[in-house]
Amino acid sequence: MTTALDQLKQYTTVVADTGDFQQLAQYKPQDATTNPSLILKAVQKDAYKPILEKTVRDHRNESTDFIIDRLLIAFGTEILKLIPGRVSTEVDARLSFDTQRSIDKGRELIKLYEAAGVGRERILIKLASTWEGIRAAEVLQKEGIKCNMTLLFSLVQAAACAEAGAQLISPFVGRIYDWYKKQAGAEWNEARDGGANDPGVQSVRRIYTYYKTFGYKTEVMGASFRTTSQITELAGCDLLTISPDLLQKLQESNETVARKLSPETLQDKPAERVAIDEASFRFQLNDEAMATEKLAEGIRVFAADAVKLEKLIDALR
């Protein structure tokens, strides 16, 4: 019997969302994604502490920022030994509102990868989908540095990323779901409000339809899943990045997975493109409470984890 994971791979590029690269082999993903929280989680495990310790030891007299960059590259290069495709490495969330420093950091990370013998075609630089982050991606893409736009919760963010020529976007299914479920409180009914009606699933479906309708080349990679049903409802999406826990559940399941998204079967096509000059972008984002709150929260969480990682490094000096 074919597993749900194998069936999903027929329609969608499967990506592993983890810093725990020892788990990669069993799921055979094409690509992998990391973020500050996942790297922080990984370096606190016994299996990965030596990577952190060696990176600090080798660069003891350098700045903490310098060491973190080398740590990200150390994880990225190890991950790339285990997958055929690309790894996503994230720019410090504290640069989310600074276009020039985001550009500089993206260039620096690519230089470090290239110095380690990794070609830029195998790297995606992750940037927050703020106005400033999107402008940084626009510059980097023109230099041949591919960008993965993260912390994306709305169609206006997706539209702006596509217009900027971003390689890929990561709409956060689970965090959208979390927000609506919390807002509904006792009124939430999983049978009624989950599955195809899941607000996170619907958001990705709307973005996918928008991109395919207007012929954008930017890849759509659903991210931040809470359940396997959120994943299977998006079978056919360009890519889906999935945690090891959910990859395991898909591998253990023989549930039939049918294709749900396809450029040939688009429904509810938009009539016109979204206006995405800066004023329109900021107003539309502000007008969507969920997207505004989740973007702000996501930046705070990633920034806080970057600070925790700095403290771990400083304690080892």
Swiss-Prot record:
GO terms for cellular component: cytoplasm. Pathway: Carbohydrate degradation; pentose phosphate pathway; D-glyceraldehyde 3-phosphate and beta-D-fructose 6-phosphate from D-ribose 5-phosphate and D-xylulose 5-phosphate (non-oxidative stage): step 2/3. Its EC number is 2.2.1.2. It catalyses: D-sedoheptulose 7-phosphate + D-glyceraldehyde 3-phosphate = D-erythrose 4-phosphate + beta-D-fructose 6-phosphate. One of its GO terms (biological process) is carbohydrate metabolic process. InterPro entries: Aldolase_TIM (IPR013785), TAL/FSA (IPR001585), Transaldolase_1 (IPR004730), Transaldolase_AS (IPR018225). It is found in: Cytoplasm. Pfam families: TAL_FSA (PF00923). GO terms for molecular function: transaldolase activity. Its main location: cytoplasm. The active site is at 126 (schiff-base intermediate with substrate). Keywords: Cytoplasm, Pentose shunt, Schiff base, Transferase. SUPFAM superfamilies: Aldolase. The keyword Acetylation does not apply. It is an enzyme of class 2 (transferase). Transaldolase is important for the balance of metabolites in the pentose-phosphate pathway. Belongs to the transaldolase family. Type 1 subfamily. NCBIfam families: PRK12346.1, talAB. Homodimer. This is Transaldolase. It comes from Burkholderia orbicola (strain MC0-3).
